[in-house]
């Protein structure tokens, strides 16, 4: 092997920082980079110069959009940090980063505790089995409540989370933390930007409380660790090392979540949380074997981090970098790869050459000769690779599980101002859809109008802004429209028969198809139940294809038909006149004929909406949610305000920000997250069909 790895695998951590928007995640990441010596000047998100937020749009909006991958060093460990966005419109970025992480730090706002997007990212982390520690940030804020934040983890996430620290003071008096494992106090020097603190005995006024909390921590660990339980019940002393080892084991098994306190903005507590990353989060050697598939045999193959095994990596993000052009972020699972060598893109079965390999720091980069298992790096030169592709040793192809991409829920029309803008827009849309699989662009063949769709208004705003800024496209943007869907609610059988005789060769296709509703989210499923060759083998794929094409345009109002099973069970053919095209048309006719019997309905996206308002405006806010066809899910108190949880159709949420602002004198805030699709009420369905007039035949 030409090069040696710089850090052993056991001393490597691949982590993500996850949070609700505004919980202080970017500031926390900044501080990590500052204390690990990667940056020399601290950037503040709210002043727009944070190191991690490297796209112009992020600098302007003060939110994190793209998961920049950064390498840092703490003590003698390498920590690769993937900065994930906290805004719900960028959920795919969070999914992508979780897919390649080994562990995560969940950042909470000490005043708010668990918020809606925290629930979302926590659930995603559960899906991918990512161990987490929690950092309760903003302890310097008025209303900061560490204990309430820990409680919210239990109540809202059902998480077995326990404090391994206790804050000293809060709001203006927050000056440090008490370590409940080593039973010492870390008190910060205000003048040293957090780079200096004193570890001292626990101040007398906190001793009793600290002893009580350590006892509670030991009890909580005993519940998930038999060895600690035995010692605890036997009244034996439990050493700090034993306690730490038990917490590590339980955290790696997703049975325990250690909680830290701090204020990234005020430079307190970040280093102790970094110690937590090392102490409790996994190295690539600690995670479960990674399951891949052999494309030749279909067999499952388990991958463990090992430099000697054949190379296998996942491309988890494509970015257009101003300096190097197309940059592919990869996570290496096994083996190693030198720059200049060839890899097989096993997902597309094509060879690609990796020109250069880069180690990324927020917005600068270092060229490296080789990457090893467990590494996260940027590759230049991969022309055909897209998000979710598997890159492997050409002699050992493997398919790693790809990413689940959610469907967009909102769309707008984009009209270029001139012919030159049209050409630039085509290039821009191709690049942007490559980078972000939840962003789609399509042109209506009849009207020539281009529609872009995405995960929310902010998502589309940012994409349009990027078209203007990066590709110099001047375009007119239409009103946002809801991405409705259609589905069947009843079983229906129908025949589709297409016969055309007009001199010369005719056309003949005849099918009987049984349509049944599928489970929500299962999509379209096709079953071939033909017996005795009544529809010849070679025409069956055409029936499947004909159905899929027809479903794109729905049966009621031109919206895609989803979650339907189709079983082809009978039909007939003509020796001479039958063709693939004829069976395609026959299938689409069967779908059309089934529509009236299958209880077709239009589905609309329902958003989970959380509104925070001062109590005096509660009546108005609740009235306005009800008026928007919202259903209440519950209410809670938070820092002197009321928090209303509800479900509201997306179509009713346009312009809500303005309504809320005026009805609460600018003091109310809201967040919304896509939750599920639901049938529209009959009157609204009729309106939609009428508006789309003519598209539904």
UniProtKB/Swiss-Prot annotation:
All residue ranges annotated as the tr-type G domain in the record: 10-285
PROSITE patterns assigned to the protein according to its UniProt record, in alphabetical order: G_TR_1, G_TR_2
Matching Pfam families: EF-G_D2, EFG_C, EFG_III, EFG_IV, GTP_EFTU
InterPro entries: EF-G-like_DII, EFG_II, EFG_III, EFG_III/V, EFG_IV, EFG_V, EFG_V-like, G_TR_CS
Family annotation (SUPFAM superfamilies): EF-G C-terminal domain-like (SSF54980), P-loop containing nucleoside triphosphate hydrolases (SSF52540), Ribosomal protein S5 domain 2-like (SSF54211), Translation proteins (SSF50447)
Gene Ontology biological process terms in this record: ribosome disassembly
UniProt keyword list: Cytoplasm, Elongation factor, GTP-binding, Nucleotide-binding, Protein biosynthesis
Keyword Nucleus: no
Compartment(s): Cytoplasm
Residues annotated for GTP binding in this entry: 19-26, 83-87, 137-140
GO annotation, cellular component aspect: cytoplasm
GO MF assignments: GTP binding; GTPase activity; translation elongation factor activity
NCBIfam families linked to this entry: EF-G, PRK12740.1-3, PRK12740.1-5, small_GTP
Family affiliation: Belongs to the TRAFAC class translation factor GTPase superfamily. Classic translation factor GTPase family. EF-G/EF-2 subfamily.
Job description of the protein: Catalyzes the GTP-dependent ribosomal translocation step during translation elongation. During this step, the ribosome changes from the pre-translocational (PRE) to the post-translocational (POST) state as the newly formed A-site-bound peptidyl-tRNA and P-site-bound deacylated tRNA move to the P and E sites, respectively. Catalyzes the coordinated movement of the two tRNA molecules, the mRNA and conformational changes in the ribosome.
HAMAP family reported for this sequence: EF_G_EF_2_B
PANTHER family (UniProt xref): RIBOSOME-RELEASING FACTOR 2, MITOCHONDRIAL (PTHR43261:SF1), TRANSLATION ELONGATION FACTOR G-RELATED (PTHR43261)
Name the record gives this protein: Elongation factor G
Organism whose genome encodes this protein: Lactobacillus helveticus (strain DPC 4571)
Gene field: fusA
